[in-house]
């Protein structure tokens, strides 16, 4: 009887966990850390590695701004108004609340293109620094 109860409990946990929609995130997210800056502000640092990635899901950042630094490879952004490729040791800035990602005009990068990115954002403590849009 004990094994039956344990088995049913395990199955119900698996069913419950499988019933939830997967949360949207950035492709290739390797790590994310937050640092308390004081005065109600936090710095969020993300590291991402991906290949053959021509875009991201539609989103915006209600942060003071976002700096994206290319550690290696090639990435692209439309933050300047036009699509631009960025390579190792280059970076771009994304203004607060700029809706981007999921654009129909996102250019395809050559097959096998990889990028390693370091993303830094400063946002109000306890608030979401990235909002994905359906």
Model-derived features: where do they sit?
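N-terminal post-signal-peptidase region of extra-cytosolic proteins
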Residues: 51-54, 71-72, 79, 101-104
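Ligand-binding loop in jelly-roll beta-barrel domains
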Residues: 97-128
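Sec-dependent N-terminal signal peptides
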Residues: 3-12
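Glycine- and acidic-residue-biased ligand/ion/polar-headgroup-sensing regions
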Residues: 63-81
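Short acidic-glycine-tyrosine-enriched beta hairpin
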Residues: 50, 80-99
């Amino acid at each position: 009887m004990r094994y039956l109860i344990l088995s049913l409990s395990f199955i119900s946990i698996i069913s419950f966990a499988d019933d939830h929609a997967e949360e949207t995130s950035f492709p290739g997210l390797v790590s994310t850390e937050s640092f308390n800056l004081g005065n109600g502000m936090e710095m969020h640092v993300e590291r991402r590695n991906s290949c053959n990635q021509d875009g991201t899901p539609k989103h915006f950042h209600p942060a003071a701004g976002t700096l994206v630094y290319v550690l290696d490879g090639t990435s692209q952004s439309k933050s300047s108004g036009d699509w631009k490729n960025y390579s190792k040791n280059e970076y771009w800035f994304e203004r607060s609340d700029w809706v981007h990602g999921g654009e129909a005009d996102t250019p395809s990068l050559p097959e096998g293109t990889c990028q390693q990115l370091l993303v830094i954002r400063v946002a109000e403590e306890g608030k979401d620094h990235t909002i994905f849009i359906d």
